[in-house]
A protein has these predicted regions:
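Short catalytic-loop micro-motif centered on adjacent basic/acidic residues
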Residues: 24-30, 129
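Substrate-binding cleft of secreted/luminal carbohydrate-active enzymes
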Residues: 143-146, 150-164
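Loop/turn elements at helix/coil->beta-strand transitions in domains of secreted/extracellular proteins
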Residues: 21-24, 49-52, 150-154
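Aromatic/hydrophobic pocket-lining residues that form the small-molecule binding cavity
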Residues: 9, 38, 139
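Active-site-proximal helices and loops of the catalytic beta/alpha 8
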Residues: 18, 28-111, 116, 135-136, ...
Length: 180
């Protein structure tokens, strides 16, 4: 709402795209910012670099941001939740799992699903292996399922080597240094 803040942030976006030719933006807690700002942001960024990728972090259904005037994609946390609830935590039976996955796909048109950013862990979540109780078989099944889904799969650093780590209650062990 503050015009000076808005102008500053748009200038930052312009600077990074023009000066450093970045390929995309990952926008944290993106649903906390006014839609009109994101429309201006997209017009500016795409005006400089039409193929610059704009990814928003929204933890719930986000169709209002995916109508072609704000983001190109979202982090697909509804699918994340369905997969981790079933494979890692064992919270759902098969029918509940199928229903949760189906709901995550029915929330969007096919072209949007094809661009969704599918993930099983991030800097904001407990790592998958920890959710699985360090059962690598469960983690592998969860990744296998994710990799077979429509959308773009993403592995949070360390997931590929089985890093663990809890998130919450003041712990940030999900952000520990990479095992090299």
């Amino acid at each position: 709402e503050n015009p000076e803040c808005r102008a500053y942030l748009l200038d930052v976006a312009r600077h990074w795209v023009q000066e450093f030719d970045i390929d995309g933006w990952r926008l944290d807690v993106a649903n906390e910012v006014d839609h009109e700002f994101w429309r201006d942001f997209r017009r500016l960024v795409k005006g400089i670099k039409p193929d610059c990728y704009i990814l928003g972090e929204i933890w719930h259904e986000g169709m209002p941001w995916l109508r072609g005037d704000q983001y190109d994609s979202l982090m697909n946390y509804p699918l994340t939740q369905a997969i981790t609830d079933f494979f890692a935590l064992g919270n759902d039976d098969k029918t509940s799992f199928i229903n949760a996955v189906t709901r995550s796909y029915l929330a969007y048109p096919r072209n949007v699903n094809e661009a969704m950013f599918n993930l099983l862990e991030s800097h904001d979540t407990t790592r998958l292996l920890s959710l699985c109780g360090n059962d690598k078989r469960k983690a592998k099944l969860a990744y296998l399922f994710m990799f077979t889904q429509v959308g773009s799969p993403c592995i949070y650093y360390g997931g590929e080597v089985g890093m663990d780590g809890q998130k919450g209650m003041g712990l940030e062990l999900n952000r520990k240094c990479m095992i090299w």
